[in-house]
Amino acid sequence: MNPSTHVSSNGPTTPPHGPHTTFLPPTSPAPSTSSVAAATLCSPQRQAVSRYSGWSTEYTQWHSDLTTELLWHAHPRQVPMDEALAAAAAASYQVNPQHPANRYRHYEFQTLSLGTSEVDELLNCCAEETTCGGTQSTVLTNATNTTSCGGAVAGSSNAGPAGASAACDLDAELAGLETSAADFEQLRRLCAPLAIDTRCNLCAIISICLKQDCDQSWLLEYSLLCFKCSYAPRAALSTLIIMSEFTHLLQQHFSDLRIDDLFRHHVLTVFDFHLHFFINRCFEKQVGDAVDNENVTLNHLAVVRAMVMGEDTVPYNKPRRHPQQKQKNNPYHVEVPQELIDNFLEHSSPSRDRFVQLLFYMWAGTGVMSTTPLTELTHTKFARLDALSTASEREDARMMMEEEEDEEGGEKGGDDPGRHNGGGTSGGFSESTLKKNVGPIYLCPVPAFFTKNQTSTVCLLCELMACSYYDNVVLRELYRRVVSYCQNNVKMVDRIQLVLADLLRECTSPLGAAHEDVARCGLEAPTSPGGDSDYHGLSGVDGALARPDPVFCHVLRQAGVTGIYKHFFCDPQCAGNIRVTNEAVLFGHLHPHHVQEVKLAICHDNYYISRLPRRVWLCITLFKAFQITKRTYKGKVHLADFMRDFTQLLENCDIKLVDPTYVIDKYV
């Protein structure tokens, strides 16, 4: 049974937006719309307690144990070496940092350990086991061949004593081979959800849950989460919120399901959520040719995998053009479900919830917050992460003892396949070191941390778009003030510098030295000067209403002039987030008397449409991959071909940015 198969509903097949077959999110079997309504009406008690509106700080709190555990799973890890190998590797890096064996040490974000993904054993979904044996042998072989060949090249190209020393340092060569092989093995396990023939684990879990969801209440709330996901920026904070709320929905409706074990035993990883909610968007109605859609997904997965593995080349395949299949309309123009959105806005109000504390907690003590101390928050987070690592080591030791006992009595009790295939252990977490200084980088759409020219692969302004309705309004006001600052032909960088200075002066209550941990001030979004908490009136026209608060100004200081310039005018990833984000929907809190009505409308219409097609997001991800990948001759040829198509794509999507050829090597 394929869990991602969309089954036609038995309800009405002509929604308000035109005649087409109505589909529900990936289910098996799919409940009819009439059964959903009947079950809802027959369960007044369940309806009264269901007040889930999505994207709320009630379900994702920075100090909760679940949040810390999710962040722990999203951190990179490094396999430790013994002292002798570590000393040899350090000496090799000092002598020849460009050696292929040392390039992977430079990419600290790559070395991590995560277990395999096996929904089958834990949930008894089906007998088929998810494996990646072929991928494993290929990756390890390539890693060994690259290092070996690289050593020969390095030895022949380096002239003088330094080159001779690097070529003859056998201990360093062995250290590089052992570390790279171990890291690649753990990266292979992490990338299991990104394989071509691996099913979506979330779809498998959803199919099981729907069989137990007798009154369809869980389906309605899951549909609301998917609806809000379509209007959320693709940022690390968005991924964390989705993971947390999805987990809470499972815990709330299926108490017998040990959701903690899904992450602890690596049945689910962060890339399962990337795949389901952002890359493949399994809940979205299929538009166009099924094979073309599959190719878009597989290409996107290959690019993400290449960034995680730190490969030298970007898996870019120039799209084939079929003249006979030309479309008269712009294929990149998306019709949004305006009637459904209007209905949602009519029965909702912008929430004052703000995820700034969670944002600071995520990136405290990392390179993303390099100029922001956050000492107390950093100390708290690191202590919690260390506690989780210690608990994981104890769990590993317990599981190993149980496996040894099972082996001793092997023929008498038989083998338990769940323990020997990696599904019951932590997959080597106890043998790896958490890279706390990098942060939960695998929550990001670009799962690699780089810095270049005062920018990084984590855009704080994109993260801020997922924080609150208020932050989106102030960001839009900031953009308006920059582009309309004066009538003279002043460069954008100068405009940003001047506007930023004005904004910092306008900040009503600047932070003093006593507020070193600025996150304490971001519990709720500020109200208007009159005390009104209704943000429908906030607009960029009234500067008093859209005035930034101290927390917002602090984030602007951290981003800097260059980061603001990159976000608004240079980066296609940021431009895509600006295009798709609808803060009124994302942070809309449904009125209590219309919660069930709106959820039913969303589930029935099944319009989970993003304002940018998945192919556009694929090209944006390719652009980001080219930015962080080392330039080789083959890579330069691919980049030239890609840039010609990419600039045309931006024009077709009506996205106006600084020419990408100017910024492809300038920022990350």
Curated annotation (Swiss-Prot):
This is Packaging protein UL32 homolog. Residues 1-10 have a biased composition (Polar residues). Residues 19-35 have a biased composition (Low complexity). Residues 459-574 are annotated as: Zinc finger 2. Pfam families: Herpes_env (PF01673). Plays a role in efficient localization of neo-synthesized capsids to nuclear replication compartments, thereby controlling cleavage and packaging of virus genomic DNA. It is found in: Host cytoplasm; Host nucleus. It comes from Human cytomegalovirus (strain Merlin). Belongs to the herpesviridae UL32 protein family. InterPro entries: Herpes_env (IPR002597).
